[in-house]
């Protein structure tokens, strides 16, 4: 029994000893396989990561390109919208400006038309007034000459027109002419008009004015001669008044004669 146990023990030891190298080999092989598998897995992971990175880069580039295209399209759309809006705004402004110009032209044309109508009306009114005055003067003259209907207004118009014609002197020297007209206005026109304002029949006093125009013309010519003589003295600054002194005195006498005639004719039957 002891021998059997000893043999069994030896066999067991032999088996154990013989089995240990194979296990180590197996362990080495298994560890080698594991390391190879790990290396392969690591390489696969690197390849996968590189592939993923490349894919991610490509995707990023694609996304960037897509975003750039989208932004470009959006900018183009915005630019187009702005251009369209600008064109519409420009067209609107041009349209408004055109309407304003047309309205301004129509307003100016209307104002010019109104001004023309008013001017035409004014001219027609002036012409009518002048025509009426001429007709009244002509009618007054005819009435006075023919002994028709007369009035103080008619007498006033007749005398006023007659004196205006007398005051239309032909003196060439304007300085002297201003003195002559002032003398005629003061000494002849004003007192005579005041005197005839209440006379109804011009025909009664008409003959008092027969020689008045010639008498005044003679006095004016004498004043022109006196002024020329006075002007020879370059140091005399009073030739205007000195040259018309005789005219002033002569008009006083002539107006007194005219007034006496008018009063006499007015008071006669």
From Swiss-Prot:
Q: What is the effect of changing residue 239 to A?
A: Reduces collagen binding. Abolishes collagen binding
Q: What is the annotated localization of this protein?
A: Secreted
S-S pairs: 208-261, 230-239
Note the effect listed for residue 261 to A: Abolishes collagen binding
What residues form the membrane-spanning segments? Answer: none
Chain spans, region GE-rich region which mediates binding of Ca(2+): 38-148
Which residue ranges have biased composition labelled Acidic residues?
A: 56-73, 98-121, 131-149
Q: What is its main location?
A: secreted
Q: Name one GO molecular function term.
A: IgE binding
- Gene3D superfamilies named in the record: 6.10.140.1890
Q: Could you say which tissues express the protein in this record?
A: Female saliva (at protein level). Distal lateral lobes of female salivary gland (at protein level). Low-level expression in male salivary gland. Not detected in female and male carcasses.
In the record, which residues are listed under signal peptide?
A: 1-19
Signals that turn on the gene = Induced by blood feeding.
Q: Where is this region: Mediates binding of host collagen and inhibition of platelet aggregation?
A: 148-269
Q: Which UniProt keywords apply?
A: Calcium, Disulfide bond, Hemostasis impairing toxin, IgE-binding protein, Platelet aggregation inhibiting toxin, Secreted, Signal, Toxin
Stated family: Belongs to the aegyptin family.
The protein here is known as Aegyptin-like protein
Organism, scientific name: Anopheles stephensi
